[in-house]
């Protein structure tokens, strides 16, 4: 059997590391990049010094400040991060022709047919990490395996500034031993549900018939059952034009408190706004999705007169969208935010200028 050779590269605390590189006084300090801790700001990235206090991305910035009062809070500089990301992706292009960017700081590379380093994906990953360090002054972690699932798990294993390899003969046993929460697509609510069923490690999924798993997991059952055996057929896909950008989350406890709903929406808004920035796009339409405790799902959308380009633009539209729902009177278990009508930022800015 011919195995694929997949490398997953993930920069270490990318935004925060760029800030520490550019300002030596920040090195060794707990740095938090994101929104203001004075309001509803959300953490976009945290240095490893800040992570030692339990601070992670998507957490409320106000909570992060309480956790670490001495933390240094910085606004994101997306233009700077994009420029460095382009430099890093240029390095990737020297090793692979099939590259799937996931974000500014993360990508999959399919090096199956490459003859670099006599076809050794491990040596290629070492060379990529070395060049990133030499050319940008930043560190990256890499995972090498025969599919995307295992390459991603491996790069997490190697963090920070490391390399981890999962060969084909070790793949099934390696993934089976992982906590169920490490699987892509298993969020906190799904993990809690599975753990109540006694499924705490990925391998525990194999004790269940696929039909029984389908009752609890729906269409995800087959994918997760394959994952438990180290199987992932997803190809590495070069970037294609996007039609929408979205994020949603199911929560372990339902709520009808509007203040809490706004708090739970904040990291989702930050996530989609960050993706919008990464792809240098603006949106014409914002859609809010709710699922009530009885599993009824609804969406509400708005298309403002001007372009939606950042988190503040989305936040300004949320109260009116929520007012069109029964949030506050009916308990909510899932929230989602999506952006559509995507256009390149410069093109939209030129059009908007011409109209005004």
From Swiss-Prot:
Q: What is this enzyme's catalytic activity, as reactions?
A: DNA(n) + a 2'-deoxyribonucleoside 5'-triphosphate = DNA(n+1) + diphosphate
Name the site position(s) for Substrate discrimination: 15
This protein's major location comes to: cytoplasm
Q: Which UniProt keywords apply?
A: Cytoplasm, DNA damage, DNA repair, DNA replication, DNA-binding, DNA-directed DNA polymerase, Magnesium, Metal-binding, Mutator protein, Nucleotidyltransferase, Transferase
List, for all copies, the residue spans of the domain called UmuC: 6-187
Q: Name one GO cellular component term.
A: cytosol
Which InterPro entries does the record cross-reference, listed alphabetically? DNA/RNA_pol_sf (IPR043502), DNA_pol_Y-fam_lit_finger_sf (IPR036775), DNA_pol_Y-fam_little_finger (IPR017961), DNA_polymerase-Y (IPR050116), DNApol_IV (IPR022880), IMS_HHH_1 (IPR053848), Rev_trsase/Diguanyl_cyclase (IPR043128), UmuC (IPR001126)
Gene3D superfamilies xref list = 3.30.70.270, 3.40.1170.60, 5' to 3' exonuclease, C-terminal subdomain, DNA polymerase, Y-family, little finger domain
Subcellular localization, as worded in the UniProt entry: Cytoplasm
* Residues annotated as the enzyme's active site: 106
> Please, which domain of life does this record's source organism belong to?
Bacteria
GO MF term (any one): DNA-directed DNA polymerase activity
| Pfam families recorded | IMS, IMS_C, IMS_HHH_1
EC numbers, comma separated: 2.7.7.7
User: How, per the record, is the cofactor bound?
Assistant: Binds 2 magnesium ions per subunit.
**What are the recorded Gene Ontology BP terms?**
DNA-templated DNA replication; error-prone translesion synthesis; SOS response
The record's listing under CDD domains reads: PolY_Pol_IV_kappa (cd03586)
Cofactor dependence: Mg(2+)
Task: Tell me which residues bind Mg(2+).
Answer: 10, 105
Subunit structure, as described in the record: Monomer.
Recorded family membership? Belongs to the DNA polymerase type-Y family.
Q: What does this protein do?
A: Poorly processive, error-prone DNA polymerase involved in untargeted mutagenesis. Copies undamaged DNA at stalled replication forks, which arise in vivo from mismatched or misaligned primer ends. These misaligned primers can be extended by PolIV. Exhibits no 3'-5' exonuclease (proofreading) activity. May be involved in translesional synthesis, in conjunction with the beta clamp from PolIII.
PANTHER family for the chain: DNA POLYMERASE KAPPA, DNA REPAIR POLYMERASE UMUC / TRANSFERASE FAMILY MEMBER
Listed name of the protein: DNA polymerase IV
Protein source organism: Halorhodospira halophila (strain DSM 244 / SL1)
| Encoding gene, per UniProt annotation | dinB
């Amino acid at each position: 059997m011919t195995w694929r050779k997949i490398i997953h590269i993930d920069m270490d605390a990318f935004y925060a590391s760029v800030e520490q590189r550019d300002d030596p006084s920040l090195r060794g300090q707990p740095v938090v990049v994101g929104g203001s801790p004075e309001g509803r700001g959300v953490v976009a990235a945290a240095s490893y010094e800040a992570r030692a206090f339990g601070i992670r991305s998507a957490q409320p910035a106000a909570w992060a400040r309480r956790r670490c009062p001495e933390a240094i809070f910085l606004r994101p500089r997306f233009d700077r991060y994009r420029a460095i990301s382009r430099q890093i992706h240029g390095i990737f292009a020297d090793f692979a022709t099939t590259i799937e960017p996931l974000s500014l700081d993360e990508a999959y590379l399919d090096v199956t047919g490459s003859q670099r380093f006599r076809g050794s994906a491990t040596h290629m990953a070492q060379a990529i990490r070395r060049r990133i360090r030499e050319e940008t002054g930043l560190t990256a972690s890499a995972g090498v395996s025969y599919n995307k699932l295992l390459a991603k798990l491996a790069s997490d294993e190697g963090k920070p500034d490391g390399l981890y390899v999962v060969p084909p003969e070790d793949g099934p046993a390696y993934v089976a031993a992982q906590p169920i929460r490490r699987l892509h697509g298993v969020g906190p609510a799904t993990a809690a549900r599975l753990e109540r069923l006694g499924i705490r490690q990925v391998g525990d999924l194999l004790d269940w018939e696929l039909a029984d798993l389908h009752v609890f997991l729906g269409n995800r059952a087959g994918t997760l059952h394959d994952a438990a055996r180290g199987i992932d057929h997803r190809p590495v896909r070069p970037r294609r034009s996007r039609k929408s950008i979205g994020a949603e989350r199911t929560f372990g406890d339902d709520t009808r408190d509007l203040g809490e709903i706004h708090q739970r929406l904040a990291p989702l808004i930050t996530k989609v706004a960050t993706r919008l920035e990464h792809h240098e796009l603006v949106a014409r339409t914002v859609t809010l999705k709710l699922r009530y405790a009885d599993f009824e799902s609804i969406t509400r959308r708005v298309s403002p007169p001007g372009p939606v380009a950042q988190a503040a633009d989305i936040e300004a539209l949320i109260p009116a969208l929520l007012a069109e729902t029964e949030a506050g009177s009916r308990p909510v278990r899932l929230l989602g935010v999506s952006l559509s009508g995507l256009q390149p930022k410069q093109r939209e800015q030129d059009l908007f200028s011409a109209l005004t």
